[in-house]
């Protein structure tokens, strides 16, 4: 996220004015050739919303937007439009406006209602910017209820949407948006990140024929002339949580647009007005059918508990919808989602480079800092994000709330496991015979090295093609230099700090991987299942004592094989992991025997997508999956449902990869249990016990 990036520009009077960089895209128009054929220019104004970052989420929302920015925007728009022309309309996501109207005093609410009636304040269809790969189709649908309720209240029809900062999204968002009348999505990419190779305006289609017009550009805002028309669309987006434009900025923007489009009428507009103006020209737009993906998705593996809770409640909500207990967009759903939707919002805490130092990385140094003011603020901002989900659960009717609380409680890792039955030590190399499978465990790594489906004789694993291979990985300054050289589009100081970990070389950071050197296996025969418990053992005490490595004290993989169906429940549990700021990643690799690389697909927000169908400069290396990933060929199918850990790397087991090479899927699918490799506002250390659950269909 490009932060505190300000540049000086000259106002119309020649005075020096300090403005956020994102407002300046239209202001560069004077350096461009005039475009006299354009007769209509529609301009959308907003600032980028981070639910946190510069401060805690509460302070950003209430102290900045509710107490300061909304009143300022109302007055700025009133003054700008006083002459009878629409020169300024301030747009916000639906969530901020919905919350403001719900919480404001009667007088402030009336002032806002009057501004909306005048057309001075507008909202778009989405609550805010998400990392959309973290969302189910029904969650996306449910989120639209906020804008639909505002539409009903103010007699509007919202058809336009915007997301800013996150470089790309999944094709799975198209059907739920199109289903509810959203026809236009504007995407402004973070200025330090490589944008996907896409036209500035295109029609994004999925295989079923659903479509969405998209405006895409490498800045928060942009300018696009609609093909085959006299229309230009402009989005003017101020910097992060920076509020409405100043009057002198508005004048400068209009002046520059007039210079670029001398024959055009320039009008401030909402995104829905822009969407409706663009609609007649959809058939003139280039068509894109590929996945784009999110090159920031590796950050979403930084808080395993938050993500596990969110995914559990999302699945439970889908079950309630299926049962008819809850309907998408009803009052119960809205009250739940107005909190839960903040979980996949793209801001996960406060700005690490502002609040933290670059000296206290190793576990012993970090432990000494955790009680200091800035570190406590950062940790609070992460806890605040987790609390959003709990606040949503608290709004549920008692019966649903009880279900949700029980589901969340079940995610707590107990200090010790309750042992069912009588575990019997089992030689790791010796096959384990169950009703449906012959199972073999690697005596060193503890991974599955044999998995034979007895009914069809299909062998899925071998010593070369193992399943559920655990790896602990550390990274180096060279890894960050390589990654930044391939991905960043700027050498600005903020980018190196956001996308790096300055000074880690001083603390001995190395790129290394650790796998178990000795696995012990116990098998328990229960009435209706077998349980194979695999304990992993590591041998590098020197690395741990140096602070370079923060391996858990205990890692156990439980394989539960029921007698009534050919599936395996796989639970990986770690306990006693030291918290560290040194870059680390924990992985579970699935690399079954496969013959046809084209047989692999990933479920992303409800659409099964080929890993080879991703646009250039999209994310071809890493995805967040909804249900899981699967291989199918020759009438046989191997599927991994990943209940808690959605982020999956393909080919290289590495969170810091940006490449246009197609992935070599024969090197495996690596489920990221946790990483702290990205800075910005993600979780930087994690010392809690973790359980990651999977279901294998073979």
Q: What residues fall within each predicted segment?
A:
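Catalytic and substrate-binding regions of extracellular carbohydrate-active enzymes
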Residues: 330, 334, 342-574, 690
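Small/flexible residues
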Residues: 4-5, 24, 311, 508, ...
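Short amphipathic alpha-helical segments that mediate assembly, nucleic-acid/protein binding
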Residues: 25, 250, 401-404
């Amino acid at each position: 996220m490009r932060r505190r990036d300000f540049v000086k520009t000259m106002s119309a009077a020649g005075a020096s004015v300090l403005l956020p960089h994102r407002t300046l895209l239209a202001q560069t128009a004077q350096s461009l050739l005039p475009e006299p054929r354009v007769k209509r220019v529609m301009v959308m104004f907003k600032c980028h919303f981070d639910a946190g970052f510069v401060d805690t989420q509460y302070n950003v929302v209430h102290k900045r937007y509710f107490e300061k920015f909304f009143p300022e925007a109302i007055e700025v728009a009133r003054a700008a439009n006083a002459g009878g022309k629409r020169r300024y309309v301030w747009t916000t996501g639906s969530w901020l406006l919905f919350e403001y109207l719900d919480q404001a005093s009667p007088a402030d609410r009336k002032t806002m209602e009057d501004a909306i009636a005048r057309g001075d304040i507008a909202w778009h269809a989405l609550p805010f910017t998400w990392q959309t790969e973290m969302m189910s189709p029904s969650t996306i649908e449910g989120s639209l209820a906020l804008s639909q309720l505002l539409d009903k209240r103010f007699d509007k029809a919202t058809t336009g949407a915007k997301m800013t900062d996150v470089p790309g999204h999944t094709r799975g968002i198209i059907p739920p948006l199109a289903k509810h009348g959203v026809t236009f999505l504007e995407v402004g990419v973070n200025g330090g990140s490589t944008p996907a190779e896409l036209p500035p305006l295109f029609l994004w289609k999925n295989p079923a024929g659903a479509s969405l017009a998209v405006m895409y550009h490498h800045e928060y805002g942009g300018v696009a002339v609609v093909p085959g028309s006299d229309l230009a669309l402009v989005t003017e987006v101020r910097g992060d949580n920076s509020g409405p434009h100043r009057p002198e900025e508005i004048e400068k923007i209009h002046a520059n647009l007039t210079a670029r489009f001398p024959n055009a009428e320039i009008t401030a507009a909402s995104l829905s007005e822009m969407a409706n103006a663009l609609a007649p020209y959809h058939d003139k737009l280039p068509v894109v059918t590929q996945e784009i993906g999110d090159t920031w998705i590796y950050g979403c593996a930084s808080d395993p508990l938050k993500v596990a809770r969110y995914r559990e409640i999302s699945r439970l909500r889908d079950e309630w919808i299926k049962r008819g207990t809850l309907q998408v967009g009803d009052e119960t759903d809205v009250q739940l989602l107005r909190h839960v939707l903040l979980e996949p919002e793209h801001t996960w805490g406060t700005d690490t480079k502002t609040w933290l130092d670059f000296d206290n990385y190793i576990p012993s140094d970090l432990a000494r800092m955790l009680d200091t003011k800035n570190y406590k603020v950062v940790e609070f901002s992460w806890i605040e994000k987790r609390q959003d989900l709990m606040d949503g659960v608290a709004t549920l009717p008692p019966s649903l709330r009880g279900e949700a609380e029980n589901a969340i409680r079940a995610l707590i890792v107990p200090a010790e496991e309750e042992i069912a039955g009588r575990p019997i030590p089992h030689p790791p190399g010796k096959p384990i015979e169950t009703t449906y499978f012959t199972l073999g465990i690697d005596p060193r790594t503890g991974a599955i090295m044999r998995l034979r489906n007895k009914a069809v004789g299909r062998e899925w694993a071998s010593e070369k093609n193992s399943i559920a291979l655990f790896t602990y990985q550390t990274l180096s300054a060279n890894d960050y230099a390589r990654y930044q050289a391939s991905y960043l589009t700027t050498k600005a100081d903020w980018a190196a700090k956001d996308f790096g970990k300055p000074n880690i070389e001083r603390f001995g950071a190395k790129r290394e991987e650790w796998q178990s050197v000795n696995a012990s296996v116990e098998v328990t025969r229960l009435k209706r299942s077998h349980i194979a418990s695999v304990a992993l053992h590591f041998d590098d005490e020197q690395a741990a004592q140096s602070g370079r490595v923060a391996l858990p004290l205990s890692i156990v993989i439980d394989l539960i094989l029921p007698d009534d169906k050919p599936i395996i429940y796989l639970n990986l549990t770690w306990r006693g992991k030291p918290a560290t700021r040194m870059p680390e990643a924990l992985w579970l690799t699935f690399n079954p025997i496969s013959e046809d690389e084209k047989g692999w697909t990933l479920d992303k927000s409800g659409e099964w997508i080929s890993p080879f169908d991703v646009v250039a400069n999209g994310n071809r290396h890493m995805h967040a999956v909804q249900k899981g990933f699967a291989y199918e060929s020759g009438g046989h199918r191997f599927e991994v449902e990943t209940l808690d850990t959605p982020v999956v790397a393909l080919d290289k087991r590495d969170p810091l990869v940006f490449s246009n090479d197609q992935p070599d899927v024969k090197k495996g699918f690596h489920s990221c249990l946790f990483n702290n490799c990205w800075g910005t506002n993600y979780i930087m250390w994690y010392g809690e016990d973790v359980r990651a659950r999977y279901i294998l269909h073979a």
